[in-house]
Amino acid sequence: MKKKKINSNNLLLLITIVLFFVMYAAGCIVYADKGFTRFQTFLNILINNAGLICITAGMTCVMLTGGIDISVGSLVAMDCMILAVGIEQWGWSSPVLMLLILAIGIVFGIVQGFCISYLEIQPFIVTMAGMFFARGMTAVICKEQVSIVSDKIFTTLSSFKISLPFGGYLNKKGIMQFPYLRVTVVVALIVILAIYLMLKYTRFGRSIYAVGGNQQSATL
């Protein structure tokens, strides 16, 4: 019988998953008396990293083309600062600011994509310039001040809990508590599903794989 060889990409994924569960198991052993073994602890990892999940899902598409984008973190910081300052200092409405930062992100990506695809500048150089620009604009907008968002829409969304009908436990007061998710996790899961379907079932998704494999062949 022929032995099946493990693909290097699958091996890296397997190692990552194993390390994750090893660290989680270590946390369960060390902090067992502090409720670390509860299912909610695992869900908190998703809750705390929902934004990062959305970003990495988009970055996956970039990496599949063989490119790189190091401006993402600075762009997110700039958009968040515009949102916070716009609500607390400029007095703009939340829906308008949400549309504004989405538009800024789209325009930012189009400009960088144009420089990379048509001007044929290396992605690392273009996105590094974008990173410094976004980081500088963030400092200019915030003026070295911290803005705490107190808008009702955001406070409601951030405090809203989606209770799960399993994994409950009794707290110190003897009240049954069930694990929960936040809205951000649902959004992250929708983003992952949308990108998966796009990559697997659309012409654009197949083009991304083709460009990453061989750009000249994909052009033909």
Locations of the language-model features?
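Single transmembrane alpha-helix segments in multi-pass membrane proteins
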Residues: Y24-I29, R38-W90, F114-I121, S217
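Membrane-interfacial amphipathic/re-entrant helices at transmembrane-helix boundaries
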Residues: M1-T56, W90-V96, K173-M176
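Transmembrane helix-bundle core of multi-pass membrane transporters
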Residues: N7, P123-T202
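Membrane-helix/interface signature in polytopic inner-membrane proteins
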Residues: T41, A194-L220
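Hydrophobic alpha-helical transmembrane segments
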Residues: N10-V18, I45, I53, S74-M78, ...
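Membrane-embedded alpha-helical core segments of multi-pass
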Residues: A50, C54-G58, M78-I82, I104-V111, ...
